[in-house]
Amino acid sequence: MSSEKAQNPMRELRIQKLVLNISVGESGDRLTRAAKVLEQLSGQTPVYSKARYTVRQFGIRRNEKIAVHVTVRGPKAEEILERGLKVKEYELRRRNFSETGNFGFGISEHIDLGIKYDPSIGIYGMDFYCCMTRPGERVAKRRRCKSRIGASHRITREETIRWFKQRFDGIVR
């Protein structure tokens, strides 16, 4: 047997999903152009998000479409996350990581991701949010024979930071 202890494959962290969000703050032409940006980036059809409340100072009404987002899973999520982290130079803050082990960050210009600039679309910033999981998480999500995940199997902030540093050779401040 090797000198180091064998790692349990059920304890390995993996990316469950990556959510890309562009919040425009108004419906109309700018929102549809933002949807085109997300479609170019992910290759999937984005979903529109509606405002929950009317806020007169911002000029938005309840149920008005104000944002667009897309959920990416699998190897495509890892590839897009890699491109997003390259823009941030693999450097995140500690407060980017949540207590439940997920993390998120934002970029100011989508053209940094390698998408060619199109004058008819413009430049949009976007938010990346990455949800982490472990094998066996379906036990809590499934419909039949639902059960709880033990405290030792839940993902913590420190575990995700360790995974981020090891996987992407990243810096956490």
From Swiss-Prot:
Pfam families according to UniProt: Ribosomal_L5 (PF00281), Ribosomal_L5_C (PF00673)
Origin species: Chaetomium thermophilum (strain DSM 1495 / CBS 144.50 / IMI 039719)
Source lineage: Eukaryota, Fungi, Dikarya, Ascomycota, Pezizomycotina
Protein name: Large ribosomal subunit protein uL5
Subunit structure: Component of a hexameric 5S RNP precursor complex, composed of 5S RNA, RRS1, RPF2, RPL5, RPL11 and SYO1; this complex acts as a precursor for ribosome assembly.
Stored PROSITE patterns: RIBOSOMAL_L5
NCBIfam families: PRK04219.1 (NF003258)
Function of the molecule: Component of the ribosome, a large ribonucleoprotein complex responsible for the synthesis of proteins in the cell. The small ribosomal subunit (SSU) binds messenger RNAs (mRNAs) and translates the encoded message by selecting cognate aminoacyl-transfer RNA (tRNA) molecules. The large subunit (LSU) contains the ribosomal catalytic site termed the peptidyl transferase center (PTC), which catalyzes the formation of peptide bonds, thereby polymerizing the amino acids delivered by tRNAs into a polypeptide chain.
Gene Ontology BP annotations: translation
Superkingdom in the source lineage: Eukaryota
